[in-house]
Amino acid sequence: MAMNFVTFNQDYSYLAVATSKGFRIFTTDPFAKSYETKEGNIAIIEMLFSTSLVALILSPRRLQITNTKRQSTICELTFPTTVLAVKLNRKRLVIVLEDQIYLYDIQTMKLLYTIETSPNPNAICALSPSSDNCYLAYPLPQKAPPSSFNPPSHAPPGSTHVSPTTGEVLIFDALKLEAINVIEAHRSPLACITLNSDGTLIATASDKGTIIRVFSVPDGHKLYQFRRGSIPSRIYSMSFNTTSTLLCVSSSTETIHLFKLSHQTSSREGSPSSALSRERAASQSSLGTSPDPDDPTDDMESSEIASRKHNGTLMGMIRRTSQNVGSSFAAKVGGYLPKGVSEMWEPARDFAWIKLPKTNQTAGANGNAGSLRSVVAMSNNTPQVMVVTSDGNFYVFNIDLSKGGEGTLTKQYS
């Protein structure tokens, strides 16, 4: 039996696992099996909070909404191409295909809106759990340049978008069904984005994986930026705690990082949060790694991106509004700093970290293909981090919220 997919529900009280032989649902505190079925090869599973409603992808293009309590099927939908991700909150159901996003009213299952996107094979998309701040975030679609080539009449229509070359995030109001902002998060294409439980913060990481940034939603002010490390790494999972005071990040390395969201670690101050972080920073710099292309000390890129013109388009209007707000904010804060320094601060390091136990899969992993994948979440009731790995292990680590430092493994299940 192979594990195909694993996810926490919106408040991290449940864990859902899709396998080649059905799916399982567990409570996280205490950890215990809540529901199991051994039928079907389930590619993706998503829960709606702690309800009995579950969304399943049974074949590449077929979605089934199931009531686990009644053991009944509510509805089934078939899509034109492979479903790559499913997102739920109490208002909306979001289906992510490689070049489209479908939005449904979750009460009636009526299709409300279809969004054309750039190719998005990694299904980079986030839906706020909040019903009030019901925002959807995804990479800004990039239009394909005009082509003089005329395909034959029998050829299928070509794509109107190309893969993104920068890390810009579009914020879409899923209730009003309109785009409301574009956040210029990174120079490199996005690898991971996540929204907090209130829909007021978004964390972003590029495919470099060295710098994590946090912006306010929907206005797009940059509030925090953190350094995960100096060596590029694939970011697999990011998760805010329910009070949005901590951000947990897992990657293709064996270290999981926790960053503290407080005034002291805002992007304008950016000092390392502990002596331990400074020691680890020094040891990493001694490796002689090259500067990170996504490092904010190279943030002169912001002015280059901002100077691009987007006249006559909705995205251009959104972008100019965002830039005007951001410029006035930066001008006020930057006035207190020497010229040339206000855009060149050192990002804060992690407040705490976790080392995953060595397993057969992690042995020899070097951060490339074949490394251990992980999904992270933080407990609502205790200062604990929950980690699920692709080799089928569930770990619980204790974190010292006053001192930070390395987390302690307290529980393990497989």
Curated annotation (Swiss-Prot):
Keyword Protein transport attached: yes
SMART domains assigned: WD40 (SM00320)
Motif (L/FRRG motif): 226-230
Composition skew (Polar residues), residue ranges: 262-289
Location(s), subcellular: Preautophagosomal structure membrane; Vacuole membrane; Endosome membrane
Pfam assignment, any one: PROPPIN
Domain of life of the organism encoding this protein: Eukaryota
Gene Ontology biological process terms, A to Z: autophagy; protein transport
Region annotated Disordered, chain positions: 261-314
UniProt WD repeat ranges: 1-36, 69-114, 185-225, 230-269, 309-355, 367-407
Claim: Transport is one of the keywords in the record: yes
GO cellular component entries: endosome membrane; phagophore assembly site membrane; vacuolar membrane
Compositionally skewed regions (Acidic residues) per UniProt: 292-302
Keywords assigned by UniProt, alphabetized: Autophagy, Endosome, Membrane, Protein transport, Repeat, Transport, Vacuole, WD repeat
Membrane-protein topology: Peripheral membrane protein
Membrane-crossing segments per the record: none
Broad class of the protein's primary localization: membrane
Family: Belongs to the WD repeat PROPPIN family.
Summary of subunit composition and partner proteins: Component of the PI(3,5)P2 regulatory complex.
Role summary: The PI(3,5)P2 regulatory complex regulates both the synthesis and turnover of phosphatidylinositol 3,5-bisphosphate (PtdIns(3,5)P2). Necessary for proper vacuole morphology. Plays an important role in osmotically-induced vacuole fragmentation. Required for cytoplasm to vacuole transport (Cvt) vesicle formation, pexophagy and starvation-induced autophagy. Involved in correct atg9 trafficking to the pre-autophagosomal structure. Might also be involved in premeiotic DNA replication.
Domain remark in the UniProt entry: The N-terminus might form a beta-propeller domain involved in specific binding to phosphatidylinositol 3,5-bisphosphate (PIP2), leading to the association of the protein to the membrane.
Record protein name field: Autophagy-related protein 18
Organism: Aspergillus terreus (strain NIH 2624 / FGSC A1156)
The encoding gene: atg18
